[in-house]
């Protein structure tokens, strides 16, 4: 009986792996219709009795401003072009920082953030961590770096019910994403760690300081030329 149970579980695991490979392969070419974070926000608003309308307007890689692409890389994942989904030195630094106490520092790459935002629910269980690693490996294998960043910029949360660069540009600055200035792009990147708490349009001292640091990092990374490294 135990052997039969293991055989059945193994079969389900194979089916899940095959289905997830097909899903990720399809989404290399087809824009994701939504994300798990969007579902959670919508359901949560219903439960709270304050339903919200989700704002999202997909923009292709060519329509997204280079300044925002580089700003997000500078603020979130400066080794994006080099790693294969996991930034091991950053993970080690985060673990050392957290062991010393103080605020908890994360080390999620853009690839990991796409995996958990698009495919997974919120939480910190070992099951979710395992699934996050699996989907990260899949998108790093089946998608290009440009596609990963494109999906990230169209799926990131930038305010209450605001998802993606186009909706963020309209919500915070009243203009289309392709018209964002370098300063505005850095401010959008600066609020990504806590988009429901911080405002890109009305930045406080910390967000202004972080945005200035991001602009400096953009220059050190080589500016828009950094994006050429994503074509390799």
Curated annotation (Swiss-Prot):
<keyword id="KW-1003">Cell membrane</keyword>
<feature type="transmembrane region" description="Helical">
    <location>
        <begin position="12"/>
        <end position="31"/>
    </location>
</feature>
<keyword id="KW-1133">Transmembrane helix</keyword>
<protein>
    <recommendedName>
        <fullName>Biosynthetic peptidoglycan transglycosylase</fullName>
        <ecNumber>2.4.99.28</ecNumber>
    </recommendedName>
</protein>
<dbReference type="InterPro" id="IPR036950">
    <property type="entry name" value="PBP_transglycosylase"/>
</dbReference>
<dbReference type="GO" id="GO:0008955">
    <property type="term" value="F:peptidoglycan glycosyltransferase activity"/>
</dbReference>
<keyword id="KW-0997">Cell inner membrane</keyword>
<dbReference type="InterPro" id="IPR011812">
    <property type="entry name" value="Pep_trsgly"/>
</dbReference>
<dbReference type="Pfam" id="PF00912">
    <property type="entry name" value="Transgly"/>
</dbReference>
<keyword id="KW-0133">Cell shape</keyword>
<keyword id="KW-0328">Glycosyltransferase</keyword>
<dbReference type="GO" id="GO:0071555">
    <property type="term" value="P:cell wall organization"/>
</dbReference>
<keyword id="KW-0808">Transferase</keyword>
<keyword id="KW-0961">Cell wall biogenesis/degradation</keyword>
<dbReference type="GO" id="GO:0008360">
    <property type="term" value="P:regulation of cell shape"/>
</dbReference>
<dbReference type="GO" id="GO:0009274">
    <property type="term" value="C:peptidoglycan-based cell wall"/>
</dbReference>
<dbReference type="GO" id="GO:0009252">
    <property type="term" value="P:peptidoglycan biosynthetic process"/>
</dbReference>
<comment type="similarity">
    <text>Belongs to the glycosyltransferase 51 family.</text>
</comment>
<keyword id="KW-0472">Membrane</keyword>
<keyword id="KW-0812">Transmembrane</keyword>
<dbReference type="GO" id="GO:0016763">
    <property type="term" value="F:pentosyltransferase activity"/>
</dbReference>
<comment type="pathway">
    <text>Cell wall biogenesis; peptidoglycan biosynthesis.</text>
</comment>
<dbReference type="InterPro" id="IPR001264">
    <property type="entry name" value="Glyco_trans_51"/>
</dbReference>
<comment type="function">
    <text>Peptidoglycan polymerase that catalyzes glycan chain elongation from lipid-linked precursors.</text>
</comment>
<dbReference type="GO" id="GO:0005886">
    <property type="term" value="C:plasma membrane"/>
</dbReference>
<dbReference type="InterPro" id="IPR023346">
    <property type="entry name" value="Lysozyme-like_dom_sf"/>
</dbReference>
<keyword id="KW-0573">Peptidoglycan synthesis</keyword>
